[in-house]
Amino acid sequence: MAKRRGLALDGVLLLDKPVGLSSNHALQRAKRTVDAAKAGHTGTLDPFATGLLVCCMGRATKISGRMLEADKTYQAMLQFGEETDSGDLTGHIVARAPDGFAGVEEAALRDVLSRFVGTIEQIPPMYSALKRDGKPLYEYARAGIELDRPPRQVTIRHIELLSFSGMQAQIDVACSKGTYIRTLAQDIGRALGCHAHLAALRRTHVGPFSLDRAVTLEALQAMPDAKQALLAMNELPAGLLPAT
């Protein structure tokens, strides 16, 4: 059977990735829906996370490198009282708050959040795609092996507290490439002395692109002509495409 090739489409699809799908699975579904021959995305979202996945079709894949380097913005829900091995709600609990913990004081939280704004050091999580000896760290983690990881510098542009209930807090975080929001949640919990993990994560911006213009897979598949959802090459923000 001949391999399905698709159309030579050029443009960018702003996809609102659903929970439960890997970024690549979401990309492949979108690629099939618009019938594109060539597609790639510009930065992985964990399966439990939702939000903006910038899918580049055809010649638009030339912007992928710049988008990987771009700042991102996320809305994250922090759950206080428990730390997990993965840093999110999918992992196993590895630490708990002291007995009698009844929630975080808002003033203490605001103080701790302010300490993480600027250039900070993060130790990448074991549950990540970073490689050691050609093997992703998450494969070692799944085998119960913990490796030393050197800290890396990242920049947190801002953290805004959106909502707070004592046991949970929703924050808006703008950050540089390579920032792990799971690690940020873990480090915030440790600084508060109560532990924390991510209960939810939603990406809202990648460089100049916003979730406001994104389409869900369901909406894309319901369109009479899904190709109309693509941003054409001449609609892309100035300066994204490399000079020819």
Swiss-Prot record:
Gene Ontology biological process: mRNA pseudouridine synthesis; tRNA pseudouridine synthesis
Keywords: Isomerase, tRNA processing
Catalytic activity: uridine(55) in tRNA = pseudouridine(55) in tRNA
Keyword Isomerase: yes
Assigned EC number: 5.4.99.25
Stretches that traverse the bilayer: none
Keyword tRNA processing among UniProt keywords: yes
Short name of one Pfam family: TruB_N
Top-level taxon in the UniProt lineage: Bacteria
GO MF entry, a single one: tRNA pseudouridine(55) synthase activity
Role of this protein: Responsible for synthesis of pseudouridine from uracil-55 in the psi GC loop of transfer RNAs.
PANTHER family hit by this protein: PSEUDOURIDYLATE SYNTHASE TRUB1, TRNA-PSEUDOURIDINE SYNTHASE
Name by which UniProt lists this protein: tRNA pseudouridine synthase B
Species annotation: Bordetella parapertussis (strain 12822 / ATCC BAA-587 / NCTC 13253)
Organism classification: Bacteria, Pseudomonadati, Pseudomonadota, Betaproteobacteria, Burkholderiales
Gene that specifies this protein: truB
